[in-house]
């Protein structure tokens, strides 16, 4: 059996030009939005990078560049579905995924189960294979000042 580990990281800053945010494929009511070329889903972006990294296929920017207008304002679930196809082509399966959302606000806990269900559905895995946790920076740094949100994702693949 062959195992591969991937790590992904993403960060987006808040903007007053939008309202509400999308994290893990779930829309969350908030007075600000996230600045991004796509929908700004930091969790899905980091997850895509984790899977691509484990497969040795670069990163999300290589496959879906922010200079390409076809990806402007696109739903990030599209990226994850395309990367799932790459995973299948390489004949790897997901053992588990562990995600950390780092945000001072809004609170993520009420939305985590919906996020897990959304991601499991796209990746065609069990919800139990995905863990999502949220933390703050205790008001330190740009996240603590509520200027943005970051995520880390680790995935373990096997074949």
From Swiss-Prot:
Pfam families: YgbB. The record marks 37, 136 as: Transition state stabilizer. Keywords: Isoprene biosynthesis, Lyase, Metal-binding. 4-CDP-2-C-methyl-D-erythritol 2-phosphate binds at residues 10-12, 37-38, 59-61, 64-68, 103-109, 135-138, 142, 145. Its EC number is 4.6.1.12. One of its GO terms (biological process) is terpenoid biosynthetic process. This is 2-C-methyl-D-erythritol 2,4-cyclodiphosphate synthase. It comes from Francisella tularensis subsp. novicida (strain U112). The gene is ispF.
């Amino acid at each position: 059996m062959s195992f591969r580990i991937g790590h992904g990281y993403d960060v987006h800053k808040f903007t007053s030009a939008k309202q509400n945010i999308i994290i893990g494929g779930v829309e969350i009511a908030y007075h600000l939005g996230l600045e991004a070329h796509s929908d700004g889903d930091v969790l899905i972006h980091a997850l895509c990078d984790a899977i691509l990294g484990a497969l040795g296929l670069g990163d999300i920017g290589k496959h879906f560049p922010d200079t390409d207008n076809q990806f402007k304002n696109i739903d990030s679930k599209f990226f994850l579905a395309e990367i799932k196809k790459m995973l299948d082509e390489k004949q790897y399966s997901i053992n588990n995924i562990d995600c950390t959302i780092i945000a001072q606000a809004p609170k993520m806990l009420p939305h985590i189960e919906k996020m897990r269900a959304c991601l499991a559905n796209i990746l065609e895995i069990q919800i139990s294979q995905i863990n999502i946790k949220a933390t703050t920076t205790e008001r330190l740094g740009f996240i603590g000042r509520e200027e943005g949100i970051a995520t880390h994702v680790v995935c373990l693949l096997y074949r």
